[in-house]
Amino acid sequence: MKTLKTTFLFVFATLLLLGCESKSEEITSKEDYSKYLSLKDNKSLSFAHKEIDFWQKKYDAAPNQISYLSQLAANYSTLFEYTGDIKNLYKSEDLLTKSNEAYNYSRVSTVRSLARNYISQHRFKEALELANKALAIGEGKKETQKLLFDVQMELGNYPEAVKNLNAIRDMNSFDYLIRLAKWNDHKGDLETAITFMEKARDIAEKDDNKGLKIWSYSNLGDFYGHAGRIQESYVSFLKTLALDPNYSYALKGIAWIVFSKERNVNEANRIIDAIAATHNTPDFYLLKSQIAQFEGNKNEEMKNRNAYFSMMEKNNYGAMYNKYNALIYADDKQTAQKALEIAKIEVEHRPTADSHDLLAWAYLNVGENKKALEIAQNHVVGKSFEPKVQYHLAMIYKSNNLALKAKPIKEELLSSLYELGPNFEKKVNQL
């Protein structure tokens, strides 16, 4: 009897312990964010619409007041930020182009604004031309050097990027610290990157600057996630939403936690559907496709992938989704050649390690293993530390009978499964 009682207590304690362990895996709580999924209004969006109406009327009444065009452009950019509607980004471009032409590209702030619009469109070389034009004007040099750093990083011109970073050095500057964080993240030093981003956040909080707090909280949400600090990531996204309830990027971050960490596919889909109702961009279909793949629902996976391509056809996104397209096409031997064509264009547009990774991955998937290895060794190894890039590198090594080189990468990837997503768990274990 005593033995039976002891056994019962042991089993009960074990079940209790398992229950506690299971509960500790739960990072999110619906009560924290559900209120952000059914918002009826968006104050930022409403204000932008009112501003557009106001400035359009003023411009119509006085077409010689060119400065009104920049006001209109800024508000159309806000519409793009909150709705994802690419037409608003192009409208902003048209207004800024018209303004720059009227000023004969002599007003530095307007030139920089158009350059930033080009960055959003992934037209990086054109953005660089405008940034250099702004630098030649001379006015507001430090602001232009910040822009130059941003563009050079996108283009993979890292020595030039560092020169501009050093030129704006100021450890008390939010703008400098966030760029220093980006530079360290690029180098693969995530811990240092987080430290500098936290310093930037502290400045934003000290100044009580709402816009900078939103920016730093959302970016820290990403950085903490990359570092496996999921609870801190979640809290940062919630802080973002507390300041801007319509900030869809933070909700997307929470959806990723729910999917990748908690494996709650129904809740992840609920969040994504709520975001897509107001902020409709193609990448949400890809996320839903990933979730369906994890569930083993091939029909739903293909339905969402087709919806992604359908949206791509209906809208002109330019080069903005080239990376997504190349990765999708590379996964299917029948479309791998398409991936190769896109990857070549990407390398031409922005010869970064990530672009060369796309090229190497595409070559691997069309059966050119040695070509893939050559590109990876020359342009990727030691130059990008993104988990997906590292996975591609391991696969390239494995396909070239270099299993010993793939082994340490596999060990590193096993600690990056949250960032990679559930669908990579089996792939990484099979390396």
Residue map of PLM features:
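TPR/TPR-like (Sel1-like) alpha-helical repeat modules
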Residues: 169-173, 201-202, 276-282, 290-310, ...
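Structural motif corresponding to the intra-repeat A-B loop/turn of tetratricopeptide repeats
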Residues: 79, 83-86, 121, 155, ...
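Generic helix N-cap/helix-start motif at coil->alpha-helix transitions
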Residues: 31-32, 66, 103-110, 137-145, ...
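N-terminal leader/linker segments that initiate helical-solenoid repeat arrays
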Residues: 20-109, 129, 162-163, 408-411, ...
